[in-house]
Regions:
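N-terminal Sec-pathway targeting helices
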Residues: 1-13
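Solvent-exposed, non-transmembrane regions of membrane-associated and secreted proteins
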Residues: 17-262
């Protein structure tokens, strides 16, 4: 009897053990959900690429290159300080230094541009009437009418040709600090009056009176370029030499400044 009761007790305990084990196993097998880490759910945002900052514009103005004359005035003036400019007429043989002797305006009638005695003289302006800056209303450059063709010897021959005022219309004067470009507007026979003595061209009325005296010339050989206008305030260059066949009169070529390059 005792043995039978013990067996039942063992059987009951066994069943309890099985039931408890099953319950324990079921509780331990429930899935565990891990919480996501913040880094695994946030999409990575690319860092913005900084835009290139443009270079600030320079506030410094561009400096212009200083004018450099094609004429070597340093060498010329070392040889003769009276040389202040250079006269050139493209397409012709006129290519001479310009000289001026302070206090002796007749000097270059009998001396060349080196200052040596010469019957051909030089191309010169007068210090009593003109500066060496070419800023006067009218500048007169003189040169002999040499039979050999030197100096202004071919001036009348050149500008008496048909279309000469167009073909040889440009006259250039070079100075150490700038160059001036002139356009020929007249070439005329003229009387022997001293232009700058008789016409004070700093006075606009006298300036216009001088121009009128040019346009009134009606002689054979007078030529005019009607396409070139000359007005008060303009700068006029006159090339003056003896008239061929009449040394008591003058032959003039007149040009007006249209551009300065500095």
């Amino acid at each position: 009897m005792k043995k039978r009761g013990l067996a039942i007790l063992i059987a009951v305990l066994g069943v309890l053990c099985v039931v408890c084990g099953a319950l324990l196993l079921q509780g331990n097998s429930a899935p565990v959900t891990a919480e996501p880490s913040p880094s695994s759910t946030v999409e990575a945002t690319p860092s913005p690429i900084p835009a290139e900052t443009p270079e600030p514009a320079s506030s410094q103005p561009e400096t212009e290159e200083p004018y450099v004359s094609p004429i070597d005035f340093a060498s010329l003036q070392a040889q003769n300080p009276d040389i202040y400019g250079w006269l050139r007429i493209p397409g012709t043989e006129f290519d001479f230094p310009l000289v001026q002797r302070q206090g002796d305006d007749s000097f270059y009638l009998t001396h060349d541009s080196d200052g040596n005695e010469s019957s051909a003289g030089a191309i010169f302006t007068e210090s009593a009437y003109n500066s060496t800056t070419m800023e006067d209303p009218v500048t007169v450059a003189y040169g002999h009418q040499m039979h050999a063709g030197t100096m202004f010897g071919k001036l009348q021959e050149t500008y008496s040709q048909e279309n000469a005022l167009e073909d040889y219309g440009e006259v250039i004067v070079y100075l150490p600090e700038k160059e001036l470009h002139y356009q020929v507007f007249a070439a005329v026979p003229y009387d022997n009056r001293h232009i700058l003595y008789n016409y004070d061209c700093t006075d606009s009325r006298r300036f216009n009176a001088f121009l009128n005296s040019i346009y009134e010339v009606r002689e054979i050989g007078a030529q005019f370029n009607s396409g070139v206008t000359v007005s008060t305030g303009d700068k006029v260059l006159v090339l003056s030499t003896c008239l061929a066949g009449d040394s008591q009169r003058r032959y003039l070529v007149l040009a007006v400044c249209q551009a300065e390059i500095e």
